[in-house]
């Protein structure tokens, strides 16, 4: 507190933004003692995320989250559903709540030549046939919703795909913190599963893969990996829960949404979606960081 108070006074800072509600107590104290504006940037309704994960203390967090947002001078939410929930349940002033979505650094899709070059690099790196369809899933595997999604891929989706002898494919799994009990997924090597682990450049995989699969059904909030995948003009098949916060009106035919737990339809779409479709320019108007930053600035003017 004292270090931050000194910095605020010396630098004549007027606004303080906190990410998530956890440091709400500190933000509120600094607002009171330094006469600054407090802005809370919510990535999702955190208490509800932990409720879906069946944490007993989610209700305590809910009340703390409510207090933090009510004490803020302005609140940024990453999607309209969260904003509407907070206005109704936390009793917030709508004029002090703005949807500022997660963003993407590119203002347009990569050139086809760049995507082809990335694909060739991935095929060479992982010994994949040029004619195979490359499916991608990535995420921190120490996070339960992602680990649950991996289990779905291994036990629900992949067996259905394997049964179709005419569909040639590989599933690449990227992400660290895979539990030791999974043994690096070596038991699945002969079942078209490639565990790449943590990769230095995930953008290479976004550019070079054919389809991003997102069978996540827990965890809440917008899935940043889906935003990034679409931004690289990568076709996406997602559960309904996994597509929260991404308007289907701006994704064209690049994202197919399936009801949670409907793995039959999910796998059918994997085999029928056309990766050659292009993400519409309206997608970048919505998710490009430059446009998002301008909206945030105007909200605080």
Give names to the regions the model predicted.
Residues 81, 100-103:
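Carbohydrate-associated surface elements
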Residues 225-229, 235-240:
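Short hydrophobic beta-strand element within catalytic cores of glycosyltransferases
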Residues 190-199, 205, 257:
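Active-site donor-binding acidic/aromatic loop of nucleotide-activated sugar
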Residues 5, 32, 56-78:
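Membrane-proximal helix-turn-helix segments that form the acceptor-binding/catalytic region
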Residues 73, 207-221, 234:
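Acidic donor-binding loop of glycosyltransferase active sites
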């Amino acid at each position: 507190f004292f270090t931050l108070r000194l910095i605020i006074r010396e630098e004549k800072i007027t606004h303080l933004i906190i990410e998530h509600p956890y440091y709400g107590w500190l933000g509120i104290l600094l607002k009171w003692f330094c006469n600054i504006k407090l802005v809370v940037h919510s990535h999702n309704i955190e208490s509800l995320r932990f409720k879906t994960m069946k944490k007993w203390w989610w209700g305590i967090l809910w009340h703390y989250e409510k207090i933090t947002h009510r004490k803020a001078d302005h609140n940024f939410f990453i999607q309209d559903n969260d904003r509407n929930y907070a206005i109704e349940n936390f009793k917030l002033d709508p004029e002090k709540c703005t949807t500022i979505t997660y963003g993407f650094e590119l203002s347009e899709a990569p050139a086809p030549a760049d995507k082809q070059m990335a694909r060739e690099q991935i095929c060479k790196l992982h010994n994949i046939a040029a004619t195979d369809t490359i499916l991608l899933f990535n995420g921190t595997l120490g996070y339960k919703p992602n680990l649950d999604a991996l289990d779905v891929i291994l036990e629900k989706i992949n067996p259905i795909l394997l049964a179709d002898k005419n569909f040639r494919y590989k599933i690449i799994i990227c992400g660290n913190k895979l539990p030791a009990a999974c043994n690096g997924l070596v038991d699945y090597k002969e079942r078209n599963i490639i565990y790449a682990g943590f990769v230095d450049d995930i953008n290479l995989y976004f550019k070079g893969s054919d389809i991003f699969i997102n069978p996540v059904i827990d965890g809440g909030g917008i899935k940043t990996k889906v935003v990034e995948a679409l931004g690289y003009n990568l076709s996406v098949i997602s559960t309904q829960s996994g597509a929260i916060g991404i308007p289907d009106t701006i994704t064209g035919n690049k994202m197919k949404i399936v009801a949670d737990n409907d793995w039959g339809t999910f796998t059918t779409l994997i085999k029928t979606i056309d990766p050659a479709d292009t993400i519409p320019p309206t997608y970048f108007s919505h998710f490009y960081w430059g446009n998002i930053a301008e909206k945030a600035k105007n909200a605080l003017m």
